[in-house]
């Protein structure tokens, strides 16, 4: 009986050691997962910072050239407004005279395709 009791004790101790090893393995696994997550987060943050810096650099280069474009567009707009204004003043009288002539000098005549029937 003592040998059975001793065998049972050995089995219980072996079971306890196995359970302890499993718990230890779970702890190591959780620790590795946390560490991997922290490393991944650090890598992601570093990548994000790099991409944001690249974006800002590109944005400033584009916005800087857009500022120059805005000035050029403004100059071209002023030039076109002046051109159209001078053209308006130059041709205003002639166009108005033509329109009034067309309105006042009416020559009634039949259309060429009209066929008169009696």
From Swiss-Prot:
InterPro entries: V-ATPase_G
Molecular functions per Gene Ontology: ATP hydrolysis activity; proton-transporting ATPase activity, rotational mechanism
UniProt key word Ion transport: yes
Protein name per UniProt: V-type proton ATPase subunit G 3
Disulfide cross-links: none
Record flagged with keyword Transport: yes
Region Disordered: start-end pairs: 19-39
């Amino acid at each position: 009986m003592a040998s059975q009791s001793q065998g049972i004790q050995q089995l219980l101790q072996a079971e306890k050691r196995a359970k302890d090893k499993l718990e230890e393995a779970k702890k190591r696994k959780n620790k590795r997962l946390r560490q991997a997550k922290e490393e991944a987060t650090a890598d992601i943050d570093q990548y994000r910072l790099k991409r944001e810096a690249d974006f800002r650099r590109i944005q400033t280069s584009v916005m800087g050239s857009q500022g120059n474009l805005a000035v050029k567009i403004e100059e071209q707009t002023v030039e076109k407004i002046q051109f159209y204004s001078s053209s308006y003043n130059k041709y205003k009288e002639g166009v108005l005279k033509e329109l009034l002539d067309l309105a006042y000098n009416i020559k009634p005549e039949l259309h060429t395709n009209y066929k008169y029937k009696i």
